[in-house]
């Protein structure tokens, strides 16, 4: 796993591209927006270094393109306007490809398959969605978890849907009892709760999602990045990231391994 590092501005061109902090005065070739704190995709480790599956992936993409990469922290819901306005060149944060999003942005091919899930306090006695009647459910603003809860809240009779800007503040409220459950991407939640016995993922919510890098609509950079991702899949680099961050081998039939076409709106 790679931490974000800062190379000197005098570094020779023979070296690989630098991945730099957003606070650096050195201008990067590519500015990448990310909701830092989104484990295990992009977050700060105990040493304060920004690390994660997607950090490693985009750092390698930058190197293959011969471009330096700067990661800037953007709330998830702000990533869409940031990429459309040109403030950032691309966005990551386990962003799900949807037909609705494809109307206004472009995605490279997917590299991870996912579903949603429900996490609760282990002491709550809640065993799944059926136990959330009249309860407060937390979601990330603008996320597919937000969309799912909004579309299905009536069926499960949620008492309230409370929106957060990222996993960390939602987890704080869950532990404190201010929300009763939290709906979000299952890989992030399984990673987060693995060393927190007070929390428990109690139900997988099948949504058939795929994650990718997001660009402004029609940006030629998307095709360049897509080609590099194809190469990295063929070399086994993306599959190796899966083993590094999830401790398990990616199945051959998943988008982590299979080279796929860039998605287009239906």
Predicted regions and their residues:
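Sec/Tat signal peptide C-region and signal peptidase I cleavage site
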Residues: 20-29
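Extracytoplasmic small-molecule ligand-binding "clamshell" domains
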Residues: 28-94, 103, 225
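Bilobed "Venus flytrap"/periplasmic-binding protein-like clamshell domains
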Residues: 31-32, 36-39, 50-63, 96, ...
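A ligand-binding cleft/hinge motif common to bilobed small-molecule-binding domains
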Residues: 78-81, 93-103, 150-151, 173-207
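Short helix-initiation/N-cap motifs at beta->coil->alpha
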Residues: 55, 70-81, 124, 161-173, ...
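Extended ligand-binding regions for polar small-molecule ligands
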Residues: 55-64, 126, 130-131, 135-136, ...
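Periplasmic-binding protein-like
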Residues: 35-36, 112-120, 186, 190-230, ...
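Ligand-binding clefts/hinges and TM-proximal coupling segments of bilobed small-molecule sensing domains
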Residues: 144-162, 201-202, 233-266
């Amino acid at each position: 796993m790679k931490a974000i590092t800062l190379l000197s501005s005098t570094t020779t061109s023979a070296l690989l591209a630098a991945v730099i902090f957003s606070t650096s005065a050195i201008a990067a070739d590519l500015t990448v927006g990310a909701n830092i704190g989104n484990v295990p995709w992009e977050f700060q480790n105990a040493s304060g270094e920004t690390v994660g599956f997607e950090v490693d992936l985009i750092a390698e993409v930058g190197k293959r393109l011969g471009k330096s990469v700067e990661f800037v922290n953007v709330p998830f819901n702000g990533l869409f306007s940031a990429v459309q306005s040109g403030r950032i060149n691309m966005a990551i944060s386990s962003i799900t490809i949807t037909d609705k999003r494809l109307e206004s942005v472009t995605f490279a091919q997917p590299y991870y398959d996912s579903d949603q899930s429900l996490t609760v306090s282990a002491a709550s006695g809640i065993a799944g969605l059926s136990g959330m009647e009249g309860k407060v459910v937390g979601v990330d603003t603008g996320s597919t978890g937000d969309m799912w809860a909004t579309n299905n809240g009536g069926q499960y009779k949620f008492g309230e849907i409370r929106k957060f800007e990222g996993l960390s503040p939602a987890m704080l409220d869950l532990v404190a009892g201010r929300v009763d459950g939290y709906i979000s991407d299952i890989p992030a939640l399984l990673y987060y709760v693995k060393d927190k016995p007070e929390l428990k993922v109690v139900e997988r919510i099948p949504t058939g999602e795929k994650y990718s890098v997001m660009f402004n609509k029609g940006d030629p950079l998307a095709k360049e990045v897509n080609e590099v991702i194809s190469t990295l899949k063929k070399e086994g680099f993306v599959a190796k990231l899966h083993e590094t961050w999830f401790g398990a081998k990616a199945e051959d039939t998943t988008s982590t391994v299979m080279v796929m076409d860039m998605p287009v709106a239906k």
